[in-house]
């Protein structure tokens, strides 16, 4: 405990386990330094390069600032009270089952991020990720770009504000989905079985069977609401220009 590390290089596994009150600066984890920090509390990592996967698990009180993950596969699992500022990460299953996260300036290349995460705020970020935010709760994303199919399935309380989203069959099976001033580009079969309150800038390619709520957009290329699957009276669709497709009752 109470360790400060500056300009260090880790080349082998498990360098910091079961530690407390750690500060690292200008430090490098090489490829074989896998599973570098587990079961550690109160740790700040600044201006570091991390080449090894499976880092940062079951940590509490973690701050990552200006950190680059060349291989972030299965990184940041089951951590609580996490702050991320200006982080670049490449790898699948980033931040699974984390709680109480505050993120600003994350650039992520990797699928299945934030699966099962809770109480997360994300700002000014770019996520290129399939299956992002699955099974998550209480997520708010602001001023960010998200691209990847099946966004947000089985989530609860997902809020997107001032975001640009590209997602095949995205935003489905969600309880309490909110979109404010968002753009949906190349997004088809959206909102299936979701309870949604969406204010969309521009058009949506297609919407399929939202369960309830209100969707406002400039236009919807194809709107499908099937009365044998959902109750059309529970969803209000407002198109500023044009709604198209079948079952589009309730357009105004």
How would you describe each model-predicted region?
Residues 1-252:
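Long, distal/terminal scaffolding or interaction modules
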């Amino acid at each position: 405990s109470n360790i400060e590390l500056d300009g260090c290089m880790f080349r082998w596994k498990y360098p910091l386990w079961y530690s407390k009150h750690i500060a690292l600066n200008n430090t490098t984890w090489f490829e074989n330094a896998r599973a570098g920090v587990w079961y550690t509390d109160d740790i700040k990592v600044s201006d570091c390069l991390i080449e090894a996967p499976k880092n940062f698990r079951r940590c509490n009180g973690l701050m990552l600032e200006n950190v680059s993950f060349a291989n972030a596969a299965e990184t940041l699992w089951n951590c609580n009270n996490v702050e991320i500022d200006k982080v670049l990460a490449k790898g699948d299953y980033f931040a699974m089952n984390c709680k109480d996260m505050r993120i600003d300036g994350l650039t992520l290349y990797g699928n299945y991020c934030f699966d099962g995460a809770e109480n997360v705020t994300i700002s000014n970020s770019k996520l290129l990720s399939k299956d992002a935010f699955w099974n998550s709760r209480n997520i708010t994303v602001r001023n960010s770009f998200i691209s990847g199919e099946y966004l947000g399935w089985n989530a609860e309380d997902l809020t997107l504000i001032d975001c640009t989203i590209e997602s095949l069959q995205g935003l489905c099976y969600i309880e309490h989905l909110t979109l404010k001033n968002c753009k949906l580009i190349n997004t088809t079969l959206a909102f299936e079985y979701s309870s949604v309150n969406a204010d969309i800038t521009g058009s949506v390619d297609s919407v399929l069977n939202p369960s309830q709520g209100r969707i406002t957009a400039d236009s919807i290329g194809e709107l499908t609401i099937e009365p044998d699957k959902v109750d059309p009276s529970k969803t209000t669709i407002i198109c500023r220009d044009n709604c198209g497709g079948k079952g589009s009752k309730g357009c105004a």
